[in-house]
Each structure stands twice: as structure tokens, then as C-alpha cells.
Amino acid sequence: MDACRAMVAVAKHHGMSVTVHRAIDRACNIMAALEDIISLGADRVLSSGGQRTSYEGLETLAKMNEVAAGRIIIMPGGGVNAGNIKEILTVSGAGEIHFSGSDTIQSDMVYREGVSFTPEILGGDFTRSESSVEKIMQTIQATR
């Protein structure tokens, strides 16, 4: 914790904002981890509420926002799209949100023999994520 606290202090000294990424979603006790992150002085925490997607973790995200009580920004992220963004923002009480608005694209890679290093469930070695302006615009529009 001391090393993390020092890192946050250095970032703040240089005028940077500090966001703790989704590591909190792996914590045994998310609310205790949230208190630890608040004590570090971070500005926000990106979370899916301990679930695969923020929609699935919506109840926990709302509770995190309640527990945080304005001491830190709870930023839902993970699986956010045009079909669920409004509900995620409303139910969680979040004022900020994170989403990729991406499509999975087949790689142009031709050589495909040998061992795959990425499980097929994650798209395999021969796909990549690419931001989609259309998906981003649809998701933003869905908040209005």
C-alpha cells in the first residue's frame, strides 16, 4: 500500500488524475478494497462490479457508489454498449462511464500453423479489436 500511495502522490504532484483499473473486480471483498483505494487518494476506480460486464455487476456498482459517497468516482466499464448504457448510468448512479465501442476484426495474418497462444473464446490469435465510430456514436446517442 505504501508504494501505491507514493505512486498516487507523485502522479498528483504532476497534476495527473489517478484511475485504478479493474483489479478491484478480483478482490475478495470489493467494498473493503474500495476503502483501500479511497485511502490511497485515487480519483476514480474503473469497475464492472466484480462481474464479467458492468451490466451483470450493476447491483454492486450501485452499492459501491453509495459506499463511496462522493469520496471517489465509480466508473462502470466492461460490456457497455448502446443497449445498456442508459440503464447502467441510471441504476449505478455513475456520472462517468468507460466503453470501447469496438468490433472484433479478423486478422490479415496469413500464416496460421502451430500453437495458438490465445484461447478461441477470446477470439484466438487471429482477431483484433478495432474501435467502431458507428458503435461509439450509437452508444453516446443512447444516453440522450
What are these regions (language model features)?
Residues 1-10:
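Glycine/small-residue-rich loop that forms an oxyanion/phosphate-binding "nest" at active or ligand-binding sites
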Residues 1-2, 17-27, 43-55, 75-77:
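Catalytic beta/alpha-barrel core
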Residues 42-55, 92-113:
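Glycine-rich phosphate-binding active-site loops on the catalytic face of alpha/beta enzymes
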Residues 2-3, 25-40, 64-74, 80-99, ...:
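Catalytic cores of alpha/beta
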Residues 2-3, 29-32, 52, 56-59, ...:
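Alpha-helix N-cap and loop-to-helix initiation/capping positions
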Residues 11, 37, 143:
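Hydrophobic pocket-lining residues that define ligand/cofactor binding sites across diverse proteins
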Residues 58-67, 87-92, 106-144:
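C-terminal helical cap(s) of enzyme catalytic domains, especially alpha/beta-barrels
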